[in-house]
Amino acid sequence: MLAPIPEPKPGDLIEIFRPMYRHWAIYVGDGYVIHLAPPSEIAGAGAASIMSALTDKAIVKKELLCHVAGKDKYQVNNKHDEEYTPLPLSKIIQRAERLVGQEVLYRLTSENCEHFVNELRYGVPRSDQVRDAVKAVGIAGVGLAALGLVGVMLSRNKKQKQ
């Protein structure tokens, strides 16, 4: 049996499981979250994430968590609490609220929704999704290079036998 989803508390990071990526928001109380809304998030939950890669601006929005999540599952995920000390709750909420309505720079690789919420909670902008994607691309590149090398060696070996 699945454990119940813990009720978010103000300052908690909320991880929302979109079909192709994870969207992040920060819970500010009374059912509301503040999050970066690039075009893929403005269009509604589950919209194609490719739109996020094609823009350099996002709007900071305050919306009900149930509307932001839509039909997608979500969880409280303060995953860096052991590595970083969260900022005081009043500072987290104040900083988040002050940004609502502002248009901010958005870059999928360096200034995305995960960077945004980690900066609010810990004062450290970081995205594990980006780091993991870069690792995966690197590993795939090494794998492709190794396959290419094996192909060249097999081809040479076959020519030598002829």
Swiss-Prot record:
GO CC, one annotated term: mitochondrion
Signal peptide: none
Residue ranges of domain LRAT in the record: 13-129
Species per Swiss-Prot/TrEMBL record: Mus musculus (Mouse)
Bilayer-spanning residue ranges: 134-154
UniProt membrane topology term: Single-pass membrane protein
Lumenal side: 155-162
Compartment(s) where it occurs, according to its Swiss-Prot or TrEMBL record: Cell membrane; Cytoplasm; Cytoplasm, Cytosol; Cytoplasm, Perinuclear region
pH dependence: Optimum pH is 8.0.
Descriptive protein name: Phospholipase A and acyltransferase 3
Reactions the enzyme catalyzes: a 1,2-diacyl-sn-glycero-3-phosphocholine + H2O = a 1-acyl-sn-glycero-3-phosphocholine + a fatty acid + H(+); a 1,2-diacyl-sn-glycero-3-phosphocholine + H2O = a 2-acyl-sn-glycero-3-phosphocholine + a fatty acid + H(+); 1,2-dihexadecanoyl-sn-glycero-3-phosphocholine + H2O = 1-hexadecanoyl-sn-glycero-3-phosphocholine + hexadecanoate + H(+); 1,2-dihexadecanoyl-sn-glycero-3-phosphocholine + H2O = 2-hexadecanoyl-sn-glycero-3-phosphocholine + hexadecanoate + H(+)
